[in-house]
């Protein structure tokens, strides 16, 4: 993985802006600590920060190829999982290769197929290709949205980057937010409306989108979306195909020129990945795999059982590690440091985020990076295969709202009267806009129609937030995390799978459990879904209280929006928040942590409300 950025403005000579271009590039150095590169051609500049994973010598970027009197230049962030097949296809068409990097395959695929190359790629990526002849720029983001690509268009020019901080470093993009941005932060956060970058004028290519910038105009195009199709496979075939698609995705993602490791939570998803990889290594005599898990200091003492998280993870982690014969290490996080890392997690996202769910992951990845550059993780199975409670509780399922954020009451309680009066309406409209796009079949039952809507909501909202979290918090330490459940072939198959098959045995992710039950311990295969762990230690809550009270004493733009009495009520009566205000576990400590992140974000980024 890497960091990419670029600036196209043919009214300027970019060679006169080298210092500014270098500053933009330097903001991405955590994404690519190994190498950096810069391409400048009068009105065009492309920047690259490289994390070396495959073909160190021949994968340097920006990479250029001359073909039929035209030079094409690429900056690429990601991993391709069908590199070998595409390379052979291109060789058969007369292309020659100087190395075995996927970057070269992507570039020559574009030369061969143009914009249709996107449909050839199986992987996680974002890239830009500059054509020196017609001075056009092609942008593309992977089908599922695992890798980010932001942009800012202005009169006569375009900026793009892996992260917003690089756009801000250009000085063209201002750290400004308007009412829409405030609604995003206060009523939708840590989620974002698809394509909306919160800062005024900043946008992001959606999953499965590409764009062409030519003659000072950007034209976006959807090259991929899930389609509603009839599921014709019977139960046995569905089980077999689910297993094949996921196993193939995992094995494709084991390719690396550097050592890789695995996240292990003791849940179904990471256990499938770990066991499949362990079996693959054993078959190919590649040795034991290395696994990591995260825990909080004294969490066994303070753990609080809930419907979302009925049991702690450590017993199941130990069981799975023994079953797969892994070299395992548990990373135990200090609760005060988890609070301290809230600030770095804002720097990683460029926005307030998942608070301690972010900061703990960031610390976890820092530790892993000391020994590894690549890891595999089990994200997104719940979104695809109905793992969350809101898929199974029909009372929640048919509520006409975002199921992970059903009420805005807690969010409203921290704001002064009259601030963002239309916040609830804003959220409602985003919800309606999304479900209206969900592809359906005329033959769908009411339940299947709603399940398609729920899949679509989770895919474009909840899942994107989790993928953003995983990308930013891991790449902040230069750790590449791969997500096999995000293979687009598996996504397509899951979208059209009837609910009675997906929920095989009337269980969340039942079809996945059934598909892999012969290789997993029964206790893990049929264990109730448990989310990413959070700290229950009162030290964390007390740290948040102390910092929030200090914030409330400041004179700041943020405090002109916040209601100190409402916040004090949360501090004094945290147990009144019985339902999460976002996701499954975010309650009183997390709303306080969100205020801490908001305060830091406004100050650190010099955010101006316009």
Which role fits each region the language model picked out?
Residues 369:
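Catalytic nucleotidyl-transfer cores of nucleotide-processing enzymes
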Residues 1-4, 22, 71, 116, ...:
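Adenosyl-5′-phosphate
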């Amino acid at each position: 993985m890497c960091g990419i950025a670029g600036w196209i403005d043919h009214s300027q000579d970019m060679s006169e802006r080298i210092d500014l271009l270098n500053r933009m590039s330097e903001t991405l150095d955590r994404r690519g600590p190994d190498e950096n590169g810069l391409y400048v051609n009068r009105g065009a500049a492309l920047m690259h920060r490289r994390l070396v994973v495959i073909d160190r010598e021949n994968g340097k970027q920006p990479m250029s190829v001359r073909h039929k009197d035209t030079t094409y230049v690429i900056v690429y962030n990601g991993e391709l999982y069908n590199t070998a097949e595409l390379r052979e296809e291109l060789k058969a068409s007369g292309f020659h290769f100087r190395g075995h990097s996927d970057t070269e395959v992507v570039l020559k695929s574009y030369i061969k197929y143009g914009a249709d190359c996107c449909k050839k790629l199986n992987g996680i990526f974002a890239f830009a290709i500059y054509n020196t002849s017609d001075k056009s720029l092609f942008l593309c983001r992977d089908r599922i949205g695992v890798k980010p690509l932001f942009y800012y268009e202005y009169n006569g020019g375009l900026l793009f980057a892996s992260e917003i901080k690089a756009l801000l470093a250009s000085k063209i993009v201002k750290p400004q937010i308007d009412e829409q941005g405030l609604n995003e932060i206060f009523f939708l956060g840590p989620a974002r409306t698809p394509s909306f970058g919160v800062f005024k004028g900043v946008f992001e290519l959606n999953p499965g989108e590409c764009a062409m910038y030519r003659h000072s105009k950007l034209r976006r195009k959807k090259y991929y979306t899930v389609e509603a199709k009839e599921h014709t496979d019977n139960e046995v075939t569905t089980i077999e195909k689910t297993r094949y698609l996921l196993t193939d995705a995992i094995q494709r993602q084991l390719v690396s020129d550097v050592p890789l490791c695995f996240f292990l939570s003791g849940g179904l998803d990471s256990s499938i990945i770990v066991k499949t990889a362990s079996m693959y290594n054993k078959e190919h005599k590649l040795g034991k795999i290395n696994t990591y898990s995260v825990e909080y200091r004294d969490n066994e003492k303070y753990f609080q059982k809930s419907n979302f998280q009925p049991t702690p993870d450590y017993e199941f982690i130990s069981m799975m590690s023994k079953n797969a014969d892994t070299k395992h290490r548990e990373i135990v996080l200090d609760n005060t440091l988890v609070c301290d890392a809230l600030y770095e997690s804002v720097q990683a996202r460029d926005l307030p985020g998942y608070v301690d769910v972010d900061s703990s992951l960031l610390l976890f990845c820092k530790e892993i990076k000391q020994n590894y550059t690549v890891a595999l993780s089990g994200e997104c199975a719940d979104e695809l295969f109905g793992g969350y409670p809101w898929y199974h509780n029909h009372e929640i399922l048919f509520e006409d709202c975002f199921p992970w954020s059903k009420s805005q009451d807690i969010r409203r309680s921290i704001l002064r009267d009259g601030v963002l009066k239309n916040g609830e309406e804003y959220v409602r409209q985003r919800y309606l806009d999304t479900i209206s796009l969900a592809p359906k079949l005329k033959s769908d039952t009411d339940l299947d129609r709603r399940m398609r809507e729920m899949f679509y909501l989770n895919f474009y909202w909840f899942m994107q937030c989790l993928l953003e979290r995983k990308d930013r918090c891991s790449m902040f330490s230069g750790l590449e995390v791969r997500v096999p459940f995000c293979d687009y072939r598996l996504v397509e198959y899951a979208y059209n799978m009837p609910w009675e098959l997906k929920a095989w045995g009337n269980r969340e992710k039942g079809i996945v459990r059934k598909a892999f039950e012969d290789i997993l311990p029964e206790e893990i295969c049929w264990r109730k879904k448990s989310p990413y762990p959070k700290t229950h230690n009162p030290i964390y809550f007390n740290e948040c209280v102390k910092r929030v009270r200090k914030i409330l004493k400041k004179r700041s733009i943020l405090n002109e929006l916040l209601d100190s009495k409402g916040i004090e009520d949360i501090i004094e009566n945290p147990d009144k928040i019985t339902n999460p205000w976002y996701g499954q576990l975010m309650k009183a400590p997390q709303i306080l942590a969100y205020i801490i992140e908001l305060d830091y974000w406004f100050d650190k980024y010099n955010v101006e409300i316009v």
